[in-house]
Amino acid sequence: MSARPPRDRGAWSAEDAERYVLSLELFGMNFGLERMRRLMTALEHPQRRFGSIHVVGTNGKSSTTRMTAAILERHGMRTGAYLSPHLSHFCERIRVGEADIAPSAFAAAVQRAAHAAELVDTAARGPDRVTQFEVLTAAAYSELAARDVEVAVVEAGLGGRYDATNVIPSKVQILTSVGLEHTRWLGPTVADIAREKLAVVQPGGVLVLGPGLHRDADAEARAVAERSGARIVRAPADPGVAVGPLGVFQRRNFAVARAAAEAYLGTLDDAKVAAAAAQVQIPGRLQVVAREPLTLLDGAHNPEGIAALAESLPEITGGRRTVAVVSILDDKDAAGMLATLLPACDAMIVTSSQNPRALPPPTLASLTGQLGGPPAEIVRDPRAALERARTLAGPDGVVLATGSIYLVADLLRTSPSRLRASIL
């Protein structure tokens, strides 16, 4: 059973809020949106007080969300964004004007959502309770409404149809890409997964499709658009401007963001688009954290994401010795990821992360050997693994830590968390 919010304690601290969120169940007993709808009712429907763009897809959601918000912000709109997961702190999930909200604002938003959740749970029949992601999403919508944002760019968590974010009357929906992920919940085929994600499409909405979409996903998109009366916009692969974040995939993501911003706002100012492209920051995606050797963190966590990463590496490494630090969760296609990553690396160190679903490093090392790669070195502590990789690469080499967003989070965290990490 989820924890009840503390009573008679006045305003919560950020630590109070984080402890409460982490006490909640990850999944409800009933799969659906009923709890979330009741939360919105208890909070007086904050999600209806701003315009919205809904971002779904297998890869590229967070980057596209940030990029779309950056373009709209530079066109004079007061923007908000909701993202998941976070890297260092829950505050990163809720952004206003391209800045994370303050810890005090996060605490107040969660406190509002917690009291709404208590009302919903008390009125519920049976043991079903509001979940962690539902409270976070409710807190985000509450805070975005309280901050008077004009438009929020909202990243879905899992799928679309029954994702807690799917209570917004979005004007524009974005499908970035579709690959085989979360098949236990979304279905075994690309078409099944696309169908679940595309359930966010609104009647008369505008559906922006990422370039290179799988043909089965494209067919589903056309069918959904026809049924809902939505207009399809196909984003090009080239954004038409220089993009600051590293990676070929980020150029594609910015092209999608540009198409979405135009669908929402109308004709865009090229200079403002170029400024957004140059200035937007994307943590955890080919993020440079050190030089000599060049050290990069990237949260690619499935074969498609690793393929996009591998495509981008040659223009970044320039043939320099590259050492990878890898951790992968146990529900991912580790073999598919490693098979794509190994040819791009000269050496590999396998490690773990705080996420309890991280594969044991010996398992990863064995799998690397089975795939014909060089012997993988095992260093269980992520920070020690990164330092070992930097030594192996030498000052002129490249170090890449990837395979899990949770590995990236561990490496970016400035100090060990006193609370257990969220696995959402």
Where are these regions (language model features)?
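C-terminal helical cap/extension that packs against the catalytic core
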Residues: 212-233, 262, 294-295, 338-398
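ATP-dependent carboxylate-amine ligase catalytic core
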Residues: 9, 27, 33-48, 74-168, ...
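Nucleotide phosphate-binding/pyrophosphate-handling subdomain across enzymes
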Residues: 151-154, 163-174, 178-179, 192, ...
